[in-house]
Amino acid sequence: MPSIFINIILAFATALLGTLVFRSHLMSSLLCLEGMMLSMFILSTLIILNMHFTMSFMMPILLLVFAACEAAVGLALLVMVSNTYGLDYIQNLNLLQC
């Protein structure tokens, strides 16, 4: 396995670990999710280019579309929570009381 794949998998694992460590802040969780999506995009692009899958060149672009939608929804949720409660701590929120 080339070292570029190991580096990208390590970046994904680091972002996943960051999500687990910084789960109390919504902004940190969103940044770690974006890091995971970016590493998945790069890894899928490299695999498709190395394996010459001509029929699945659209997969990384579809992944970027979903990442952009996830970022937009996450930032809208962050703005709503910070305007309502004045902070972005997830542990202090009870989302069942809408």
Curated annotation (Swiss-Prot):
The EC number(s) this enzyme carries: 7.1.1.2
Assigned keywords, A-Z: Electron transport, Membrane, Mitochondrion, Mitochondrion inner membrane, NAD, Respiratory chain, Translocase, Transmembrane, Transmembrane helix, Transport, Ubiquinone
Annotated membrane topology: Multi-pass membrane protein
Enzyme kind, highest EC tier: translocase
Compartments (UniProt record): Mitochondrion inner membrane
Entry annotated with the keyword Electron transport: yes
Pfam families: Oxidored_q2
Entry GO terms, CC: mitochondrial inner membrane; respiratory chain complex I
InterPro entries: NADH_UbQ_OxRdtase_chain4L/K, NUOK/Mnh_C1-like
GO biological process: ATP synthesis coupled electron transport
Stretches that traverse the bilayer: 2-22, 29-49, 61-81
GO molecular function: NADH dehydrogenase (ubiquinone) activity
Record's catalysed reaction(s): a ubiquinone + NADH + 5 H(+)(in) = a ubiquinol + NAD(+) + 4 H(+)(out)
Keyword Acetylation part of the UniProt annotation: no
Domain of life where this protein originates: Eukaryota
Family assignment from sequence similarity: Belongs to the complex I subunit 4L family.
Primary role: Core subunit of the mitochondrial membrane respiratory chain NADH dehydrogenase (Complex I) which catalyzes electron transfer from NADH through the respiratory chain, using ubiquinone as an electron acceptor. Part of the enzyme membrane arm which is embedded in the lipid bilayer and involved in proton translocation.
Subunit structure as annotated in this protein's UniProt entry: Core subunit of respiratory chain NADH dehydrogenase (Complex I) which is composed of 45 different subunits.
Protein name: NADH-ubiquinone oxidoreductase chain 4L
Species, as recorded: Propithecus tattersalli (Golden-crowned Sifaka)
Phylogenetic lineage: Eukaryota, Metazoa, Chordata, Craniata, Vertebrata
